[in-house]
A protein has these predicted regions:
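Alpha/beta catalytic cores of nucleotide-metabolism and tRNA/nucleoside-modifying enzymes
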Residues: 1-13, 17-164
């Protein structure tokens, strides 16, 4: 991000963002915006078929770099538009199913709350301050594990947390 500073070229964080904390980290690292389409997958408003599987509700999800999406027209985003031979396309995404999340507004509400909390942890009232004063601290795998719920069985799912 520092290489782009002052050039007028925005830095876009794209890929690997799963939680609101990841958005805060991307912005603190100098990102100007984030790509969070996969975070919206599974919402009522997201494209995709609603599926019942093993008694639970899911939505189909097609990453823009998936072979299916490329066949449907996104290949030009990956500079492969001229490759009409489907065997020559090089996919960067997948087709899958994701748990149904409810309304988009609920997901956005949770994300905004998480971003505000993350900025609060950093003492940053706005994104510019976050970029200027945000600090990264390396922690061990054991510390990461300890920072999440452990030695329990979750009995009620939270809208902003999932066990992976």
């Amino acid at each position: 991000a520092s290489a782009a500073r002052g050039t007028g070229v925005p830095v876009i964080a794209d890929g690997g963002l799963r939680y609101s904390g990841d958005i805060v980290k991307a912005l603190a690292a100098g990102g100007d915006c984030v790509m969070i389409g996969s975070m919206f997958a599974g919402t009522e408003e997201a494209p995709g078929e609603t599926i019942i599987y093993n008694g639970r509700k899911f939505k189909s999800y097609r990453g823009m770099g998936s072979l299916d999406a490329m066949k449907a027209g996104s290949a030009d985003r990956y500079f492969q538009k001229g490759d009409v031979n489907i065997n020559k396309l090089v996919p960067e995404g997948i087709v899958a199913r994701v748990p149904f999340k409810g309304m988009l507004s609920e997901t956005v509400f949770q994300l905004v709350g998480g971003i505000r909390a993350g900025m609060g942890y950093c003492g940053a009232p706005n994104i510019e301050t976050l970029k200027e004063t945000g600090k990264f601290v390396k922690i061990s795998a054991a510390s990461l594990k300890e920072s999440h719920p452990h030695d329990i069985h979750i009995t009620k799912e939270a809208p902003n947390y999932s066990v992976e």
